[in-house]
């Protein structure tokens, strides 16, 4: 009898955990106010070989929009490129789409971030034999 109670309790715990994971999978940020225009700024010097520029973006917090400056970062693995995040319009709200690393630069809203990110693709460098130029 104890085994049956334990098995049922374990099954219930697994089901509740799965429900919690599933419910958090679709969390996103939406705002009814458009983000401000991108500021004009100078790109700092690249700190060394293999660094990729990740452009700044407008984030949204309790006090409204705030600017997150761009920075040079090392890719997490050779061959990966950064796709910037962007604010898109849909269903009457602005929705933020997170940036991500991948084997190619994906869609980032057609936003001209400059510094190689002109709205389509990336023209800021390339991978060759495991090194970024």
PLM features: residue spans?
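Classical secretory targeting signals
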Residues: 1-26
